Structures are given as C-alpha cells and as structure tokens.
Amino acid sequence: MTTLLNPYFGEFGGMYVPQILMPALRQLEEAFVSAQKDPEFQAQFNDLLKNYAGRPTALTKCQNITAGTNTTLYLKREDLLHGGAHKTNQVLGQALLAKRMGKTEIIAETGAGQHGVASALASALLGLKCRIYMGAKDVERQSPNVFRMRLMGAEVIPVHSGSATLKDACNEALRDWSGSYETAHYMLGTAAGPHPYPTIVREFQRMIGEETKAQILEREGRLPDAVIACVGGGSNAIGMFADFINETDVGLIGVEPGGHGIETGEHGAPLKHGRVGIYFGMKAPMMQTEDGQIEESYSISAGLDFPSVGPQHAYLNSTGRADYVSITDDEALEAFKTLCLHEGIIPALESSHALAHALKMMRENPEKEQLLVVNLSGRGDKDIFTVHDILKARGEI
C-alpha cells in the first residue's frame, strides 16, 4: 500500500496486518496528516493539553538525592498530568482524530492501566464509547486503575489467554478492531504497532521533550548531558527523545526492564536481548523462543511488561544515537524508595527504572559534573499495593 508518510525507521516498522485493516490504517494516516496541517485541530489539541491535562508539566530539581556528588538531576514531572501519567497526552490527540474520522467507539489495550485510564477519560470527555482489553494478571495487580476506568464509563475486558498480560491484551484489541473498524478507532497506547501509530504517538508525545528543552535552558542555561526514560513499548521515551535527536551532544538513554536479571530470562529487554521479527503489526526486536514463538516478558512494572519495542527505538539503537540499558526489579524498587524518602515524590515503578539508572550514573562517578534529566513518566499511586506486599514479605515494614 502506498503511504503518505514513511512507514519505516531504517529496516524497522511497516504494516504487517491483515488486509482487512489496511483501509482503516490508511484512513487514520490521512486523518493524521490532515490534522497536523489544520490550525483548528492543533488549537483544540493544545487547549485540551493546557486546560484539561495541565501542561506544561514542571521540571523539578532534586534537592537531596544528589548530595555528595557533582550531578545535577531534574525530573520531568509527567506524574503531575491529569490521569497520572504521560499517557494522557497522546490519547487526547487520538480521541480528537477519532472524532475527526466520525468514529463513535474507542478500543484500547492497557498494561499498568495508565493508558486505560487515559483512554477512558478522553472518551468520557469527548462522548465516545470505550472498551479496554487488559491481561487478567494486570487486572489483579492494578485494581485501582481498573476501578478508575469503570468509574469513567469504560468497559474493562480481562484477557485470560496466553500469559494474561499486555501482549495478550494487544492481540485481543487488534482482533476486536478487525471486526469493528468502521465505527471504532483503535487507540494504541505506545509508540509501536503498525504504521502510522509509531509516528502518531511520537508526535502526540513530543511536547515532553520540547518543554524539557525550553525549561532546562531557562534553569541551567544549557542542554542536559543526557535525558533518561524507561522503555516498554517506548512512548514516554520517544516523547522525551524526539526534540533532542538532532542535539548530538545530548545523550539519549532508554532503560528496559531487567526483571529478575537478564541471565534468568525473566525480563523485558528485547532491544538488547531479543531478535528481530514480526509482531503486533511491525518489524522490530522482540523476545522469541528458538523456534520463533513470542516469549513471555516479565517486569515488576506492568507497563513495561511487553515483549517487543517501538521501531524508532530499534532504529536509534541500531545507529547508536541512543543507548539502551536494563535495570532489575530490585534496582527499580530501591530507586522508588529513594525518591519517596528523600524527595517526597512517589514515582511509578516504570519511571523508577529510569531513575535507578540515573542514580547509578551518579554514584558510579560522583566527581563527574553532569546535568541529567529523568522523565518521571507517571505517579506511583497505582503501585503502592505491589510495593507494600514486596516490602512486607521482606520484613521491611
């Protein structure tokens, strides 16, 4: 199919979907390209971001955790956004696109529940019906977010097949959309999947990096040495990275979930420890068995528990423009506790992975003068029960 925008990032990306979905993807691409040129659409989107979601979000300088080092550490506070995470940014854009295309329903998948909450709130705001697929395991470990979705009128559908996590929810959402695309828009929650989703999600998240650049220049008079973000599918990270890609003096660091340790096989780090294949409508690195079956990913954080990654991250990794590392559950949990105890901020477990790597950079070279920005992609309210149970089992509380 001829596309208006390039569907690939190097060799990664594409549109590997059943033929029945091609017209829906073409319609979506046309609507997006048209909307990007429409001042009225942009004004409506920007108004929602400012007056509904609460942008711009703060850039907070850490006061205490850098003590004894020469690191200056800032947090981009996406946790302060309405809905509790960066997810709200792009769902408002996609919901406006859905209305523009004349759709009346939203289909979404969710892992941690943050994209589900964001989809539910955008649907409620704009008068769209909403059904959300969620792995049965995630329904259990993210019960507060499940209730939030239902409070806002969304139908939450637990998925029991496979590993009963995010990848299975994605499969069910795509299956639903195959039969309902004439009236429904599939509101994909990350910068992955078939074209044009990776591009759409990046563009509807890029204000994270744009704001960060303006704020850090105002505060410090220079660009950061590195920006750091967690990577599951990769939407918060690509939103942070997008405006810095051409700033070659700024390091881009993506942090994948190392789970129980890469050597155990129980992780979610396909960029560094997967193989390229076709999954979820795209060509990208993914966790696979020797015979090519999709392997189960694992992370303490439901939002990073995904066996593949967005194609632009795969490209940035292949060219060396961005560096990708992994952080274990234990390291993320320590970072979570550190931010709570010393800065009075409760981060999402997803964001705690990015914070953990920043703390590691700081502690490994305390004499080095460095200016770092961590994208604090979400707040940790949803994770307090998970953390409570772990700390209780360890006898720490």
Swiss-Prot record:
Q: A single GO CC term, please?
A: cytoplasm
One of the Pfam families matching this protein, by short name: PALP
* Residues that bear N6-(pyridoxal phosphate)lysine: K87
The record's listing under InterPro entries reads:
Trp_synth_b_CS, Trp_synth_beta, Trp_synth_beta/beta-like, TrpB-like_PALP, TrpB-like_PALP_sf
Show the stretches that span the lipid bilayer: none
- What reaction does this enzyme carry out catalytically? (1S,2R)-1-C-(indol-3-yl)glycerol 3-phosphate + L-serine = D-glyceraldehyde 3-phosphate + L-tryptophan + H2O
Pathway assigned in UniProt: Amino-acid biosynthesis; L-tryptophan biosynthesis; L-tryptophan from chorismate: step 5/5
Which GO MF term does the entry hold, naming one? Answer: tryptophan synthase activity
Q: Does the keyword Chloroplast apply?
A: no
Cofactor(s) listed: pyridoxal 5'-phosphate
Q: Which domain of life is it from?
A: Bacteria
Question: Might you give the EC number(s) for this enzyme?
Answer: 4.2.1.20
**Gene3D superfamilies, per this entry?**
3.40.50.1100
Class of enzymatic activity (EC top level)? lyase
Q: Which UniProt keywords apply?
A: Amino-acid biosynthesis, Aromatic amino acid biosynthesis, Lyase, Pyridoxal phosphate, Tryptophan biosynthesis
Family in the record: Belongs to the TrpB family.
Instruction: Report the protein's function.
Output: The beta subunit is responsible for the synthesis of L-tryptophan from indole and L-serine.
Relate the assembly described in the record: Tetramer of two alpha and two beta chains.
Give the protein name, as stated in the record: Tryptophan synthase beta chain
Organism encoding this protein? Escherichia coli O6:H1 (strain CFT073 / ATCC 700928 / UPEC)
Q: What gene is this protein translated from?
A: trpB
